[in-house]
Every structure is written in C-alpha cells, then in structure tokens.
C-alpha cells in the first residue's frame, strides 16, 4: 500500500487476519527517512498504528535491510500460529541501488519459538481422561486446518468413536457425511452440538479459542466436562475456559500421539443423542425452511448450491445471516474450502477474499456468498474482477435489510428497526456495467437453473437471489445465554 491513507486503510484487514490466524505480508510505502516525524505529506506512523493488529512489524530505512526484513516477515507470518506482518519502507530505501541480496535464512530467530515441543506427560494425561470418558466430545477448530491435521482428526475420531462438531472456521476439517460428524457449533449452530456441550463429561478442544461465539455465557459452559485443550498458541489455553489438561503443541503432532495412547472405543448411544436433538431442529427449523410457502429462503438457496457443487467448491462468505445459513447448509467436503471472517466479523470481506481464493486456486470453483449490505461495502472490486478477468461467482442473497441486526431488533427490541433497511441499486445493471454477466432470480422454479447457469459460466458471473425480507436464522443463542440455551424459534413474549 502507499504511505498515509493507503497504509491506514490496511488496519481492518490486518485485524481480521490477526484474529483469524491468516498469514499476510503487507508492504507499505513511507516518506523519506529524514522527513519522519515532520508530518510530511502522507506521513503516518503505520508501524505504531499496526502494533495491535500484527504479529510482527518493522520499519526499514536503508535498502540493505530490505531483504532480511522480507525473509523474516514471510517466515513469521507463516509459522507457528499464522498471522499478519507489516514492513514499512521509506522512500529513500526504495530508491537505493544495491547489489543482489544474499539469501537470508530465518529459521532461528531469537525469542521466537513457533513450534513448541510436544510434552508427552500431557498427552498421557489427556489419553487417560479420554479412555475413561462415557460422553466425550471433540470441538474442532481452524487449528486442525492450519496444521494439516484433518486426516489425523478422522483417524482419532474413528478409533475412539468420539463425535466431532466444528466451529465456524473449522468447517471442512471433518467430513460432513461421516457418522461421527454431529454438526456446526456456536451462536447459530446446530441444536445437538450446542445442547450437548453441557452434557459431555470430557470436552476436547482442538485448535480453537473458546471465544464467546462458541461458549456463550462462559460461567455456565460445559459444567459437567473435564476440558482438554490442544493449541499451538499458549496464550489461548485457559484464557477463557478452565483447562484440566493443556497440550501446547501443533494439532497434528498432538493427534498423532493421542492416536497411539487412546484405546479403541465406540459411543453409539452418545452419538445418537446428537442425532435426536438435530432431528428436533429439523422438525422445527429446517423442514420449514426447505418447504417454504412464499419467498425464496436463504436455506434453500444454499442447499441447492451445495448439491450442485457437491460440496466441493471454495465458498467465501461475508458477515451476517447468509454466513450462518451457509455454515449450516453447505456441506463442506474438503479442508480449506470454507473462507470467512470469523473473529472480526468484517462486512465487505467476501468479494475481495473470493478474488484472492480464485487467484490462489485457479483450478477450483470459487463462489462468494454475500448479503446485499456487505456487498455494497466492497462492490468497487468488480472493477478489479473485470480488469483481471477473475472467474469468481458472486451470489448475493438480497433481503433489503442488514438482516442479522434486523433480526435482533425484531426479536428483542419490539421491531424498532433503526438503520437496517436497505435502499439498493439495480445490482444486475451494476454488474453488467462492469461487463460481468448477471441475472436476478425470485421464483423457486427458476432457482436451480439460475444457479447452474452461474456455476457453468467460464468467467465471472453475478446472481442476485431475492429472499424473504424478514426471514430469521435459527437456531440462535440469546444475548447473555450459554450455547446450551439455544433457541429454535422466537422467544415467548413476556
């Protein structure tokens, strides 16, 4: 980015990357070194500005230091718990001519220990708890994906018979069609995984932060459980929930060790309890969404998308109702196919992120699923899509509201709608102005054909699906509630 406003515009993206453990290397321009501190044109102290939102940053004022800084930046960003780094380079350093820089090896940085040694006493203690458990439960987070441990998680679950639920960022790390998979956990997660959090006797959290979207009211969270927490970042262990056994390690190494120490076992009745609870959700929520009487629903749009892509597309979601619906109804079959803004909840994320996913995985189908509110926050990126002919498919679920905020205003604030209703442009004409083929679908009998047309397009394509204005997303955890307090329908009026 350029100096000044170009650099400060990176802050939200860096914050998003930091909390979601995304490796990013940002290079910013800066004024001449002799002008630093003089409030020169487009001078901002970007290094101090970005300290809270980066894993590491540095300012380079001499050309000889550029190569070591770049090598160190890429190493730090991608190792350990990944995260964003920033290099700020002054104008004079950019203008200097230097000889070919030498290769810089950065695998030994003083005080930086990206991969902790596995402590076998902790593994043995965890295995003892697991072997004695009657109702064990695995919560699988993004750390599984970051360590490449999906296969190890599958082997561990199959050997021990332990049910697996995924967090928002963990989706895709475990096959959704596996009998041990019990669903998506959290604020708008499936009924079974949420309710049974307070029924398990051993809870195994792997590569997750136990943040508020996963726990709800932490004082009442998993009260019957003895908790095992596996994470590469020591700062996350016991930060929110009290951990009985902490395994500070790479998830893949920890799971490999646990597979060796844990005894073969099955828990059919325990897994069946998840199925029964999820059936209650189906009867009250999913059945209604898949058998609608009037407008298209978000659930049926995403279900059709999942079926047509066989769960194999890279799906990039924005933030809001559509994000939660996609997490519940899209059957992510493969690791690293679910891309979303989980911790920061950054509206406008999906369109630029989908562009990056498409460029990074050119052999994969990439679909950006976006609400009409978030879409307009970065809609200018249609110009980039047009310029570089990026074949991303854009699916906007249009309910003419900032739907998630409206849902809370409706359910808990007596429909006092404030700044949530949208006045939208003609999205089809807007896409066409960028020379992107576009279509709008409102009728149920045209939905499948419209989605197929979008997916079959050789280049970029825009599809607007008009859904019910006041459709709500259930299950949901009410404010102040624990995840086990999850609601399947609007709360009764007092």
Which role fits each region the language model picked out?
Residues 86, 229, 316, 369-370:
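Generic enzyme active-site microenvironment
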Residues 277-352, 357-358:
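Active-site diphosphate/adenylate-binding microenvironment
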Residues 82-85, 265-278, 462:
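Flexible, glycine/charged-enriched surface loops at secondary-structure junctions
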Residues 1-266, 304, 308-311, 391-394, ...:
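N-terminal alpha/beta PP-like core and its mobile active-site loop of ThDP/TPP-dependent enzymes
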Residues 27, 35, 41-42, 237-240, ...:
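Thiamine diphosphate
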Residues 141-145, 291, 371-373:
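Conserved short loop/turn motifs at secondary-structure junctions
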Residues 88, 316-318, 464:
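Short beta-strand segments
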Residues 202, 314, 365-367:
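Structural motif
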């Amino acid at each position: 980015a350029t100096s000044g406003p170009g650099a400060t515009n990176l802050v939200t993206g860096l914050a998003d990357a930091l909390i979601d453990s995304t490796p990013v290397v940002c290079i910013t321009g800066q004024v001449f070194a002799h002008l630093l501190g003089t409030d020169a044109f487009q001078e901002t102290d970007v290094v101090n500005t970005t300290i809270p939102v980066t894993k590491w940053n540095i300012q380079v004022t001499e050309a000889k230091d550029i190569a070591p800084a770049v090598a160190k930046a890429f190493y730090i960003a991608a190792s350990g718990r990944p995260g964003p780094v920033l290099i700020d380079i002054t104008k004079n350093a950019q203008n200097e001519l230097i000889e070919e820089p030498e290769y810089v090896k950065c695998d030994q940085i003083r005080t930086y220990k990206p991969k902790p040694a596995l402590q076998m006493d902790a593994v043995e203690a965890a295995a003892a708890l697991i072997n004695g458990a009657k109702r064990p439960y695995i919560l699988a987070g993004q750390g599984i994906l970051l360590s490449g441990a999906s296969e190890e998680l599958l082997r561990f679950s199959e050997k021990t018979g332990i049910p697996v639920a995924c967090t928002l960022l963990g989706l895709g790390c475990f096959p959704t069609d596996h009998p041990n998979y019990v669903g998506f956990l959290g604020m708008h997660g499936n009924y079974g995984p949420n309710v049974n959090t307070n029924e398990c006797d051993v809870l195994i959290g792997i590569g997750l932060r136990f943040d508020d979207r996963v726990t709800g009211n932490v004082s009442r969270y998993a009260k019957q459980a003895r908790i095992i927490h596996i994470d590469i970042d020591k700062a996350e262990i016991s930060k929110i929930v009290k951990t009985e056994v902490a395994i500070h390690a790479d998830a893949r190494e920890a799971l490999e060790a646990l597979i060796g120490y844990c005894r073969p076992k099955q828990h059919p009745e325990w897994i069946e309890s998840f199925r029964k609870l999820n059936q209650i959700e189906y009867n009250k929520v999913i059945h209604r969404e898949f058998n609608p009487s009037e407008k298209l629903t978000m659930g049926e749009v995403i279900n059709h998308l999942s079926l047509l892509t066989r769960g194999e597309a890279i799906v990039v979601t924005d933030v809001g109702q559509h994000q939660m619906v996609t997490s519940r109804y899209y059957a992510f079959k493969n690791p690293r196919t679910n891309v979303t803004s989980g911790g920061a909840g950054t509206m406008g994320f999906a369109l630029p992120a989908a562009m990056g996913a498409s460029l990074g995985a050119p052999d994969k189908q990439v679909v950006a699923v976006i609400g009409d509110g978030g879409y307009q926050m970065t809609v200018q990126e249609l110009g980039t899509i047009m310029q570089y002919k990026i074949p991303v498919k854009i699916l906007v679920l249009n309910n003419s509201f900032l739907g998630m905020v409206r849902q809370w205003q409706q359910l808990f604030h007596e429909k006092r709608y404030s700044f949530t209703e949208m006045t939208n442009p003609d999205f089809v004409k807007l896409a066409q102005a960028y020379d992107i083929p576009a279509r709008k679908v409102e009728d149920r009998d045209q939905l499948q054909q419209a989605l197929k047309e979008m997916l079959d397009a050789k280049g970029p394509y825009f599809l607007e699906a008009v859904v019910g204005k006041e459709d709500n997303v259930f299950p949901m955890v009410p404010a102040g509630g624990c995840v086990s307090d999850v609601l399947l329908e609007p709360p009764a009026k007092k």
